[in-house]
């Protein structure tokens, strides 16, 4: 909808359950969460079990470029709203089905909640610390990734339909989307038997690439994109001799000795404050950032520019 499409959301007669969610701030007396996900959309309330309402849904589908659903597999076919049923009267129609686990998985009929997808897709296993175990990724990774990949599929499918006059049916699964976002972890594990483990506040294959504590507040340092960042970093910290230490000669070696390196860095950073290091490392072109709270982020990016 934000890109200019007319989006018609079909809700049950009682409305999307998210409308009634009163957790957090309200917008005009309604759910702020619902507004976040649905602003710009039009809404129609229909009972698809009623023939008259089902006919209305079919008319909407046949007048649209794309029909998108997030039902469990088989539901759209039951209502005659699947691509095979509609394409006879609308050859250019694009159908996108987003589900938790796709249509042929043994889990196909299972409910696809975000936390379940995080668990089954490996995301939980690499989040958190080894001492405390897996931790919930505190945003809707599976939900959001599935929606984004579905949006990409829609854009590509509409382009094809406009060129050929024929639409297709596509499936997107939240689980596949979350696994794809795991990136290197899946690649390494699949090819070389890489043993994934919780990343804690850094990355086991990158160093220094982590959260570090200063004298007062933590910062993030990512001095691994190019060797010059590493050299600039250790120069600012006054430990340039590490460039000749065989344990830290390159990222591969630094990753193998990450605990030793982390201890050295922490010892240096804890002498000065966060703001001091942000200034000095920034001047040296070292990738560094403060760790902002969500409140600080909202204030920073909604405040008028000076």
Where are these regions (language model features)?
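N-terminal helix-loop segment corresponding to the beta1-alpha1 unit
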Residues: 1-166
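Glycine-rich beta-alpha junction loops
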Residues: 14, 100-102, 174-179, 216, ...
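Short Gly/Pro-enriched turn/cap motifs at secondary-structure boundaries
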Residues: 34, 199-204, 209-211
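Conserved Rossmann-fold dehydrogenase catalytic segment
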Residues: 103, 131-139, 162-178, 197-204, ...
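Oxidoreductase and adenylate-handling cofactor-binding alpha/beta cores
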Residues: 147-167, 180-191, 234-240
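Aromatic-enriched alpha-helical interface/lid elements that frame and gate functional surfaces
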Residues: 208-284, 288
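Conserved PLP cofactor-binding pocket of PLP-dependent enzymes
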Residues: 282-300
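Conserved small/polar residues in nucleotide/adenosyl-binding loops
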Residues: 301-306
């Amino acid at each position: 909808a934000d890109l200019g499409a007319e989006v018609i959301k079909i809700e049950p007669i009682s409305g999307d359950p998210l409308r009634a969610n009163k957790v957090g701030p309200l917008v005009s007396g309604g759910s702020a969460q619902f507004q976040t996900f649905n602003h710009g959309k039009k809404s129609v309330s229909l009972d698809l079990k009623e023939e008259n309402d089902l006919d209305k849904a079919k008319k909407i589908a046949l007048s649209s470029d794309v029909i998108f659903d997030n039902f469990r597999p088989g539901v759209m076919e039951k209502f005659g709203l699947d691509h095979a049923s509609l394409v006879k009267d609308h050859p250019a129609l694009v159908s996108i089905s987003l589900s938790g686990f796709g249509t042929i998985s043994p889990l196909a009929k299972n409910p696809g909640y975000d936390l379940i997808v995080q668990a089954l897709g490996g995301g939980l296993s690499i989040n958190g610390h080894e001492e405390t175990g897996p931790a919930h990724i505190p945003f809707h990774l599976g939900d959001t990734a599935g929606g984004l990949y579905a949006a990409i599929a829609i854009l590509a499918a509409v382009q094809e339909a406009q060129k050929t006059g024929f639409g297709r049916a596509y499936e997107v699964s939240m689980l596949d989307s979350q696994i794809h976002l795991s990136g290197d972890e899946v690649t390494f594990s699949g090819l070389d038997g890489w043993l994934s483990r919780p990343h804690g506040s850094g990355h086991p294959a990158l160093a220094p690439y982590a959260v570090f504590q200063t004298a007062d507040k933590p910062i993030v340092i990512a001095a691994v994109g190019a060797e010059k960042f590493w050299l600039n970093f250790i120069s600012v910290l006054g430990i340039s001799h590490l460039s000749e230490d065989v344990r830290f000669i390159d990222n591969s070696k630094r990753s193998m000795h990450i605990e030793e390196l982390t201890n050295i860095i922490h010892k240096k950073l804890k002498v000065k404050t966060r703001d001091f290091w942000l200034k000095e490392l920034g001047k040296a072109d070292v990738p560094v950032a403060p760790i902002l709270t969500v409140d600080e982020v909202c204030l920073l990016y909604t405040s008028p520019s000076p």
